[in-house]
Swiss-Prot record:
One of its GO terms (cellular component) is ribonuclease P complex. This is Ribonuclease P protein component. Its EC number is 3.1.26.5. GO terms for biological process: tRNA 5'-leader removal. Consists of a catalytic RNA component (M1 or rnpB) and a protein subunit. InterPro entries: Ribosomal_Su5_D2-typ_SF, Ribsml_uS5_D2-typ_fold_subgr, RNase_P, RNase_P_CS. GO terms for molecular function: 3'-tRNA processing endoribonuclease activity; ribonuclease P activity; tRNA binding. It comes from Clavibacter michiganensis subsp. michiganensis (strain NCPPB 382). Belongs to the RnpA family. It is an enzyme of class 3 (hydrolase). It catalyses: Endonucleolytic cleavage of RNA, removing 5'-extranucleotides from tRNA precursor. HAMAP family: RNase_P. RNaseP catalyzes the removal of the 5'-leader sequence from pre-tRNA to produce the mature 5'-terminus. It can also cleave other RNA substrates such as 4.5S RNA. The protein component plays an auxiliary but essential role in vivo by binding to the 5'-leader sequence and broadening the substrate specificity of the ribozyme.
Length: 113
């Protein structure tokens, strides 16, 4: 579970990260990363549209992404903000594949900052 300080919570922050951040894509997500001040915590945010599925499916995907992100917190530099926009099809992705894809995408996005 991600602590509140490790989550992107405001709509304005989402907008800034998606517009100004560096993008990396996988088959099931678009990852945007934006560097911030080194004294700020690493933050993750998720955008899951209704095209992914009904509310139960979207919440399942969100919970899985939160679990993956919690494991990636210490591998991302402090102050980095990451937004993961889910594409349709992620709900069918196996857990192991999801972990590998997200770790790879986040690493690539952070490297380009």
């Amino acid at each position: 579970m991600l602590a509140r300080r490790n989550r992107v919570t405001s709509g304005a922050d989402y907008r800034i990260i998606v517009r100004r951040g560096r993008r990396t894509t996988t088959g099931t997500a678009v990852v945007s990363a934006l560097a911030g001040p080194d004294d700020a915590p690493t933050r993750f945010g998720f955008i899951i549209s209704k095209k992914v599925g009904n509310a139960v499916t979207r919440n399942l995907v969100r919970r899985r992404l939160k679990a993956v992100s919690a494991g990636l917190l210490h591998s991302v530099p402090p102050g980095t903000s990451i937004v993961i926009r889910v594409l349709p099809g992620m709900e069918r992705t196996a857990w192991d594949t999801l972990q590998e894809e997200m770790a790879s995408a986040v690493t690539r996005a952070v490297r380009t900052i």
